[in-house]
Design a protein with these regions (language model features):
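Short, P/G- and charge-enriched loop/turn segments at secondary-structure junctions
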Residues: 12-18, 280-282, 290-294, 409-411, ...
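Catalytic cores of secreted or luminal carbohydrate-active enzymes
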Residues: 377-398
């Protein structure tokens, strides 16, 4: 029985606006099993959907995130797959309660003004006998040729996208989550593995397509069909691709030759940004191009910047320990990274625990180390992320033109030695413009001069070095000194004090 009396009509009425590409997107990625447990020492204990309603919904609202992304809730036999080896494409996992309990959780997020994105895996399925593999004793759902049908990375099987029945099964599953569970978006997992016949395969392990290429023509047609059907029937939702290659037009409409997704994860930004921030600050001057590079291809797609679960597992170390320096510098660097992320164009995605500087890699068997919030450094980092979420919501320049070319402008990329970087974010109204100044070294820079067009009066709206964020609180800009240097171009010189390893945002 799937009957439920929904009470989220206000959200559903407005969600086209909340899910639009010119709306703020800050997404909190959550694994329900391990966010918080009723008994942190018992790895078999789970909070129910009803308990999550009491615990998770108020937390996400208080933090200011616009959306939550749930790692796969579709039924799956093995906890250790994190949900990515699903067997029930039409069922939320019964670990936490009934389908109606899950509907009530989605409804609670909607009533709190928070969108719900579901991780969805149409790329492969496990070989469990009670699942889809050899469903009727033959290769029903998977390709019979194991060069196409077997996934070496995950020891799983790949859907046969050539079969109309299989395509119908998967598209029906996507529609089911939008229709029955009021999902606001699907984050489609491992799209690259669907697109490429030679994904994770060496020569001889794959066969080219009929044109001699490495693209899976049937999977490409399925993806286009999926997105066309979704946006035709649910025009106010989003589909988001996790796609790690440079496949063109992933988030371009199908009529323009694209795959038709609404957004795509910006894996290149994530790799370059983490590589840069891992560097000792003295080395950063030699790697400033990494910063400029993201904007060289940013407008190719509608990008979302992901700091996801994949970056804090398998020995990659938690975010705080990726940062160089002593304890204070690690936290200052991480606040600086998050400030850069939240002022860079595009959607944002942050995995649970990243917001307060978890000191351990994520482990699906245990809850997050919430006891860290007893330490001012972690508690104040969380406050900083909260304020960045609200800065994003409250400043139109950070989202109105996030996918439009004139929404961003480099102001200063020339001071490599000092590693000071300045850019402008533009809204529809010029008075909403923001100047973002990032100081990537542990050196305070007083009276730093910035030359920019605009107005005579600027005020500081964010400073990552405030005492309330565990910063020094010594360097701030109540009223920057501004003077007109060129009347014709309305060019102003703005004097700013820059904190060590700090970000300053002026309006």
């Amino acid at each position: 029985d799937m009957h439920y009396e929904w009470q989220d009509e206000n959200w559903m009425k407005d969600r086209k606006k909340n899910n639009a590409l010119d709306a703020p997107w800050s997404v909190y990625e959550v694994h329900l099993n391990s966010w918080m447990r009723p008994d942190k020492n018992d790895e078999e204990s789970y909070n129910s959907y009803a308990q999550m309603q009491e615990l998770l919904v108020p937390y996400v609202k208080e933090m200011g995130f616009t959306h939550i992304e749930l790692m796969p809730v579709m039924e799956h036999p093995f906890d250790g797959s994190w949900g990515y080896q699903g067997t029930g494409f039409f069922a939320p996992t019964s670990r936490f309660g009934s389908p109606q309990d899950f509907m009530k959780l989605v409804e609670a997020f909607h009533q709190a003004g928070i969108g719900v994105i579901l991780d969805w895996v149409p790329s492969h399925f496990p070989y469990d006998a009670h699942g889809l593999f050899m469903f009727d004793g033959t290769h029903t759902y998977e390709y019979a040729d194991m060069r196409k049908g077997y996934h070496p990375d995950w020891n799983s099987y790949i859907f046969n996208y050539k079969r109309g029945e299989v395509k119908s099964f998967l598209i029906s599953s996507a529609r089911f989550w939008f229709d029955k569970f009021h999902a606001d978006g699907l984050r489609v997992d491992a799209v690259s593995s669907m697109l490429k016949l030679n994904y994770s395969r060496t020569e001889g392990q794959w066969e080219p397509n009929e044109f001699g290429g490495d693209g899976n023509i049937e999977a490409i047609a399925f993806i286009k069909d999926l997105n066309e059907t979704t946006f035709r029937d649910f025009p106010d939702v989003q589909t988001i691709a996790e796609e790690s290659t440079d496949w063109p037009g992933v988030s371009k409409p199908t009529f323009a030759g694209g795959l038709g997704f609404g957004m795509k994860w910006m894996m290149g930004w994530m790799h370059d940004t983490l590589d840069y921030f891992k560097l000792d600050p003295i080395e950063r001057q030699h790697h400033q191009d990494k910063f400029a590079f993201s904007m060289m291809y940013y407008y190719d797609e509608n990008f979302m910047l992901p700091l996801s679960h994949d970056e804090v597992v398998h020995g990659k170390s938690p975010m705080i320990y990726k940062m160089p320096g002593d304890d204070w510098q690690k936290f200052a660097n991480l606040r600086l990274l998050y400030s850069y992320m939240f002022t860079h164009p595009g959607g944002k995605l942050l995995f649970m625990g990243n917001e307060f500087g978890s000191t351990t890699e994520w482990n699906y068997k245990s809850e997050l180390p919430w006891e860290l919030l007893q330490h001012p450094s972690h508690k104040m980092l969380k406050d900083c992320v909260r304020d960045l979420c609200f800065l994003l919501r409250n400043e139109p320049a950070l989202y109105e033109k996030q996918f439009v070319q004139d929404g961003f402008e480099w102001i200063d990329l020339n001071h490599r030695q000092e590693s000071v970087i300045v850019y402008r974010r533009k809204g529809i109204l010029p008075e909403n413009d923001l100047l973002v100044i990032l100081n990537m070294t542990p050196v305070v820079r007083n009276d730093w001069k910035i030359y920019a067009q605009g107005k005579e009066t600027w005020k500081e709206v964010f400073n990552s070095d405030e005492k309330k964020y565990w910063g020094t609180g010594d360097v701030f800009n109540p009223a920057p000194v501004v003077k007109l240097v060129d009347k014709n171009t309305q060019q102003y010189e703005i004097n700013v004090h820059l904190p060590a390893l700090g970000a300053v945002v002026l309006k």
